[in-house]
Amino acid sequence: MQEYEKSESLYIVLISIHGLIRGHDLELGRDADTGGQTKYVVELAKALAKQPNVEQVDLVTRRIVDVEVGGDYAESVEALAENAQIVRIDAGPEGYIRKEELWDHLDSFADNLLSWLHGQPRWPNVLHSHYADAGYVGVRLSHLTGLPLIHTGHSLGRDKCRRLLARGLTMEEIEQRYHISRRINAEEETLSNADLIITSTGNEIEDQYELYDCYTPEKMAVIPPGTDLDQFHPPAASNASSAFAASLKNFLSQPDMPMILALSRPDERKNIVTLLEAYGESPRLQAKANLVIVAGNRDDIREMDDGAQGVLTELLLVMDCYDLYGRVALPKHHKADDVADIYRLAAASKGCLLIPL
């Protein structure tokens, strides 16, 4: 067991393995693995680094060498903010793979991360894992080093399995597609070994973690996600001239009508196809408001993964079936920094926001 230096200034290691993580222009919605968790961990690292008792924050993820996703993700170290950086660790194939295919490579990730930690000037005070795959790694590192482990689940396998079964999928289908048993086993192990579990809501503790054999509510604490008030603020007159607002004019016959906004990645679990069908079934709603669905970023749907391709194709088919041209916008691109403007645009239109779950 490694002895680590006790210091008043904290060195925190965040572990978030899957998806595309970088310090600028986050590609949120590019695929099912690059969503809210990506934004969360990057902002968390920056916020922690600003704390007066924090000396260093390292956000550790998987290094990806793949021309299909770009060179940023191949950099071993990327400066994130003062006292914060992204560290990328090799594990498994060089190319980008979805999180369900990472399980066989997590032991390698843990070994390589441990080697990297041994080469640093000081030992961390705490490990903070994010999602089941990082929890698997965090448990092993905690056992090897004696470091305390904090864990944030973000989403949970047992809850997901329950929802998929309710939609009519069989356990065999769920296992084949999501390797759900490996995920749930990792979550049970993490719950059993972590010193602290962070959740966003009390519901997460009472209704989701309660499904687990290793349910330990006394080790759980609710820390609601924060809001960047410099970015998220009420709409101003200048908001109407934003680039995103201009792009909607290519889709909408009456762009000044109230907006029903849905923003999510193109994932079948988000149920945005049903939203479009409901809008298509309601001429009264169509007369009152436009529907704007911001479903990630796309260049060529034919080159996207099967899940995103299926959702986007179905959206276009439903849009055509109900002849919703001029009433529905499905913009192809937006930047992460556009999200606040998109929300303000919906508010300024006196529309509403739907949260696909």
Task: Describe the residue ranges of each PLM region.
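Catalytic cores of nucleotide-sugar-dependent glycosyltransferases that transfer UDP/GDP/TDP-activated
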Residues: 1-357
